[in-house]
Regions:
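Alpha-helical transmembrane bundle of multi-pass membrane proteins
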Residues: 1-80, 102-382
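Short intracellular "coupling" helices and adjacent cytoplasmic loop segments at the cytosolic face
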Residues: 80-94
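Cytosol/matrix-facing amphipathic helices and coiled-coil assembly/linker segments
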Residues: 90-104
Length: 382
């Protein structure tokens, strides 16, 4: 859901939940024992309770309300987001688009939604992309650093436990600040593809640098290149937040078909947690057995996922949710490359049809079928 000329600010709550400073504080203030490891876990209850409390005052999703034919409430919800009146033209136009998107579609239960994911190739592709995005997000190595940063910093020369925890805390602050900047200033102005492509390439280079450093200098003693590698860890956090920190969640929810979005995002969320667990379990073994190869794996994965986005995912920035389906119609590869950095130069004069051109063509086809006494295809009903 997106109103014209309205930019939604996605909250960086997920970045705020990292208790790195709590870990640092208890390590220097509380003697080793059960309380020292229990307290950081207990503290995480606080943001969860606050999140639950404040969600009680949030309006329902306009699309959820439209699906249940509560149109007046949907208009109020849209107006709340846009900070305008429910009767304003922008709200009514967006509401009409949402209603049209649901027209002719029955309300599906969760199991039925999973069955409908293979309805056709286009729907299947739109359902797969969110899970692929979250799969790649985990293989970028972000949770390997989040969970094992003290060990990683120690391997890079910060031997003291307190110092490594402090360095981990600084890493968390860097990610939090960068997340706020990206959500406020970058994600809408740069677009989804640019942030994912440039962020993936940059974070991949940082991982490859760290892997190369550890391969050449396995001894944790400090040399001049050690400081460059420590900076590379922080730059990795910056570039991750720039691209693969939150953009996969935004892009995934946008490309998912509206009538299947709950099931699609449930599958994407399940993929996230499955591979979070896989990375958490695999990283210690990887660091112990392939050492520097661990960073190379994450670096190569980051470059690969940037390449996949470049060639296989269309740009959704500025496109209302109700029009995203048109991005997957006709010459999808051309559209994906055209939207990518440097893509227009590569394609030369070749261009994909615009959304308006696709709508007009679909309308003409529907009119022809109606004139011949045939029902218009559902996919061409706007």
């Amino acid at each position: 859901m997106r109103l014209p000329r309205v930019r939604l600010f996605r909250s960086p709550l997920d970045a705020c939940r990292d208790p790195v400073w709590v870990n640092y504080g208890v390590s220097i203030q509380i003697a080793p024992g059960e309380l020292q490891w229990r307290l950081p876990i207990i503290v995480q209850i606080i943001p969860g309770v606050l999140f639950f409390f404040f969600m009680l005052f949030q309006p329902e999703s306009p699309r959820w309300l439209v699906e249940r034919e509560r149109y007046d409430d949907a208009a109020k919800s849209l107006a709340y987001i846009a900070r305008t009146d429910p009767s304003s033209p922008a709200v009514q136009h967006t509401l009409a688009e949402i209603r049209a998107d649901f027209a002719g579609r029955p309300t599906l239960g969760l199991i039925a939604q999973f069955r409908q994911m293979g309805e056709n190739k286009t729907i299947a592709l739109r359902c797969i992309i969110p899970s692929v995005l979250t799969f790649f997000q985990q293989w970028s190595g972000t949770n390997a650093i989040n969970y094992y940063a003290p060990e990683i910093f120690a391997a890079l020369g910060i031997a003291s436990t307190t110092a490594s925890l402090f360095a981990t805390g600084v890493y968390g602050v860097v990610k939090f600040v960068m997340t706020c900047i990206v959500l406020a200033c970058v994600i809408e102005s740069w677009g989804r593809k640019r942030t994912l492509v440039w962020g993936g390439l940059a974070q991949g280079l940082m991982m490859l640098w760290i892997g190369g450093y550890v391969a050449v200098h396995p001894d944790p003693s400090v040399v001049p290149a050690t400081y460059v590698s420590l900076v590379a860890v922080y730059l990795y956090g910056v570039f991750f937040c720039l691209g693969w920190g939150f953009t996969p969640l935004v892009l995934g929810s946008e490309v998912a078909p509206g009538h299947l979005r709950p099931a699609v995002m449930a599958l994407a969320s399940g993929t996230t947690w499955l591979f979070t667990y896989v990375i958490a379990q695999a990283t210690p073994s990887m660091l112990a057995h392939i050492t520097w190869g661990t960073y190379v794996v994450f670096g190569v994965a980051s470059v690969a996922m940037a390449a996949w986005v470049w060639i296989g995912v269309p740009e959704t920035t500025g496109v209302p949710l109700e029009d995203v389906k048109w991005l997957f119609e006709d010459d999808l590869w051309v559209r994906c490359v055209e939207d990518a950095p440097g893509g227009r130069w590569l394609l030369g004069k070749r261009r994909a049809l615009t959304i308006d051109e696709l709508k007009n063509r679909a309308g003409a086809r529907a009119a022809e079928k109606t004139g011949e006494g045939e029902p218009a295809d559902e996919q061409f009903i706007i």
